[in-house]
Amino acid sequence: MNNKSNFKLEPDVLLQIYTTMRQIRAFENTTDELFKKGIVKGTAHSYIGEEAIASGVCTALDEGDYIASYHRGHGHCIAKGADLGRMMAELFGRKDGYCQGLGGSMHIADMDLNILGANGIVGAAMPLSTGAALAAKLRGTNQVAVAFFGDGASNQGIFHESLNLAAVWKLPMIFVCENNQYALTTSYRNTTAVAQVAQRAAAYDIPGITIDGNDAVEVHLTVLEALERARAGEGPTLIEAMTYRWGQHSLRANLQDPRPKKEVDSWLERDPLKQMENRLLSKKVASKKDIKAISDATNKEIENAVGFALKSKEPDMAVMLNSVYAPHKDHIEPGSTCNRTLSFVEALNEALHQEMALD
């Protein structure tokens, strides 16, 4: 993959990427503050320091493309266009949240936006995205599915199973490994045999590339190239975006941070938001006044989202019970006949097809 020079980013795209990064940073800073006050329920995993990845990826996607996320998923949902008020309400455990307050931070989904959901199960985004990509290919819709996951998830069996199937069937997929260096408290260097996760793509004969995950433009251009391959029927791409989470594993973390201070400080100096801001200024895409206006506007958006969430009601017990099962569908079982002779395997297959059609 070396055709990134074929793509030129217009000023409006650069501003869109930066604005999205600003939204994510403001949302996460506010989430952190409200968690400490006990307003955010459960736990949450901050995306601060990794904003360039979600913004660079999702601004390259078409509206109909799919994404699936993981426990550190606020940024992905925001970048794909999720409603900030409903997201905040979900974190508050309120009825107007995406899951009516029952899912919390790790389970935000919006099927209208093809956000298949964040997920508390490590690596679960990959099979969900693989299924979405298979459906898109069978329907011939030209949609692409993106799976976001961390470096720790690349050591799960489902990583290899998903890459293998996607490669065999040449599914329109992009696997985005957000390598923030640590799976909870364990460095990926102590758990991963290869130097880079992207090297594992070779086993499935698909492109694998390691990029600077703090450079939103590099992320965006790399994804544009992967999208071009996917829509052309050439199959999936594995992108490893090297980055760093600024805080501990979660906002509720009560473990000693094992990361060396010198290492943390060096990554903090590589602030992806500041890098993008400097790019806009140096290329005269935006002035300092424009930057401030974007910052003020995004802060106001988050303020409004908090206000919406605070006004939302707590879910009642009926919601808890009614949300457990899917709506029941009555259907009449086909009557039995005795005018055909079927083998056991044929009868079993026919019954399965009937049940699948009724599901």
Residue ranges and their predicted role:
Residues R72, E178-Q181, G213-N214, M242-Y244:
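Short, ordered loop/turn segments at secondary-structure junctions
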Residues M1-I53, G247-H249, A253-D359:
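Conserved acidic/glycine
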Residues G75, Q181-L184, E218, R245-G247:
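Short gly/pro/ser/thr-enriched loop/turn and capping motifs at secondary-structure boundaries
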Residues E228-G235:
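Long, amphipathic alpha-helical stalk/connector segments used for oligomerization, subunit docking
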Residues K36-I39, H107-I115, T141-A145, V176-Y182, ...:
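Gly-rich Lys/Arg/Thr-decorated short loops/hinges at beta-loop-alpha junctions or inter-strand turns
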Residues K137-T141, A193-E225, L268-S295:
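Conserved thiamine diphosphate
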Residues N29-D32, I39-W169, S187-A193, A198, ...:
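Cofactor-binding active-site loop characterized by glycine-rich and histidine/acidic residues
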